[in-house]
Design a protein with these regions (language model features):
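Generic structural signal for beta-strand residues in well-ordered domains
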Residues: 99-100, 108, 149, 158
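Radical SAM enzyme [4Fe-4S]-AdoMet core and its adjacent flexible, acidic
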Residues: 1-102, 106, 112, 123-128
């Protein structure tokens, strides 16, 4: 059975690089995400990104890039699932129709049968889209949480990272009182660009080491 570990990095975390290294050394597939505002408003400082915290992300990714360079040269496995999924997109020049399949072929179901488009929305009863015990509910309905990439606003359409971040997480936008078609706030968008550049650089290293026979 396939599985992965998921964890969230808060904006005040001074050990971003070390967090990635910890999960790589576990040698278990994992996904890390940067925290964003939610219904828990008591810790908003953990989801607010300053210029300093954004620069910390940039420096951590630069340091991690050197580690992955060594990993690839040695022919060792990378356990970062976000990276490996991006590799597939780059390798086959695939363009995602939307960033997330929530409400299309992915749903969250609670013990009482309540259905949500996304696990991030399950704290709000207003986001219940049906119940598995309701015979009238049809999964084939157009319930996608994420818009088609061509429906994103003009700022996203002109961005070089459009086909990598695909506009960003729609649940994150909803938590920020934005529409799914809108762009993320500047700080969050900046982090997405740092990560997109990082994915491209690691993929370039991956291709170079393969061509060298490693």
């Amino acid at each position: 059975m396939s599985f992965e570990i998921r964890a969230t990095i808060t904006s005040d975390n001074p050990y971003i690089y070390e967090t990635y290294r910890f999960f790589e050394e576990l040698k278990i597939p994992y996904t890390l995400a940067f925290a964003y505002p939610s219904d828990n408003t008591s810790n908003q400082t953990l989801t607010t990104y300053s210029n300093e915290s954004i620069e910390r992300v940039r420096c951590s990714m630069a340091k991690l890039l050197l580690d992955y360079k060594d990993t690839l040269k040695k022919g060792e496995k990378i356990y970062n699932n976000v990276l490996t999924s991006q590799f597939s997109l780059f390798e086959y020049r695939m363009i995602r129709e939307r960033i997330c399949s929530g409400g299309v072929n992915y749903y969250t179901v609670l013990a009482d049968g309540s259905i949500f488009k996304c696990a991030h929305l399950m704290n709000n009863k207003a986001d219940i889209i049906g119940n598995i015990y309701d015979d009238n509910f049809h999964f084939g309905a157009n319930l996608a949480i994420a818009p088609n990439i061509n429906e994103l606003e003009e700022k996203c359409q002109r961005c070089w990272a459009k086909h990598i971040c695909s506009g960003g997480c729609p649940a994150q936008k909803l938590s920020l009182s934005r529409k799914a078609e809108q762009s993320l706030p500047e700080a969050n968008c900046g982090i997405e660009k740092i990560l997109s550049e990082f994915y491209l650089k690691v993929y370039t290293l991956f291709k170079q080491t393969r061509q060298c026979g490693n």
